[in-house]
Structure formats: structure tokens, C-alpha cells
């Protein structure tokens, strides 16, 4: 019994580098299987699939999700700061600067 093969990409972006790996995998493969097969975990040992979230075309998915032909599997880095907190601080700084004018 042969399984249909599909084309996918595994992507990991760093601040100054983006790694895109193109693979041909069995259609039945899960996101986790594809990531492990890609070799990206060896290239970037800081990736921890129990910590890093993953997605397909900017939509979060679970590691056991199935993929479709031409899907882009993205491995997300953990946020270093809370976006709400950053916006709040910027607003405070802008308000303080406006009050000094």
C-alpha cells in the first residue's frame, strides 16, 4: 500500500536569519513527525517542541495535526515580552513626552 507524497516547508525564523526547509513527505505525516524528520531540531537545539508553539500559515496547530500539500509548518520562538505591557509602556512614554512639550 503506497501513501501519497506531498510537498511541505518547515520554517524557523530568528531575528537575523530565516531557515526554510523544503520536504517531500507522506500525506499521513503529522506536524511533529515532519519537524523531527526535517533535521531542524538538530540545527537549532534551542527548539523545544514542549515549549515552542507551531503553526501552519500563521494558525496555531497541535503537533498531531495533519498537513496538506504545500503547507508551511512554522515553529514559533517564545515571546520575550508581553505585547500588552510593551504597548502600555509606549503609551505612557508618549503621554509623558507630550506633557513635557
From Swiss-Prot:
It comes from Vibrio cholerae serotype O1 (strain ATCC 39315 / El Tor Inaba N16961). InterPro entries: Mopterin_synth/thiamin_S_b, RnfH, RnfH_sf. Belongs to the UPF0125 (RnfH) family. This is UPF0125 protein VC_0850. It holds the Pfam family Ub-RnfH.
Amino acid at each position: 500500500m503506497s501513501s501519497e507524497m506531498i510537498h511541505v516547508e518547515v520554517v524557523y525564523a530568528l531575528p537575523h536569519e530565516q531557515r526554510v526547509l523544503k520536504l517531500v513527505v507522506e500525506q499521513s505525516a503529522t506536524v511533529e513527525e515532519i519537524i523531527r524528520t526535517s533535521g531542524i531540531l538538530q540545527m537549532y537545539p534551542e527548539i523545544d517542541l514542549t515549549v515552542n508553539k507551531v503553526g501552519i500559515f500563521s494558525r496555531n496547530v497541535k503537533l498531531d495535526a495533519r498537513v496538506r500539500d504545500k503547507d508551511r509548518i512554522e515553529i514559533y520562538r517564545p515571546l520575550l515580552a508581553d505585547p500588552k505591557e510593551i504597548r502600555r509602556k509606549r503609551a505612557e512614554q508618549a503621554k509623558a513626552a507630550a506633557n513635557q512639550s
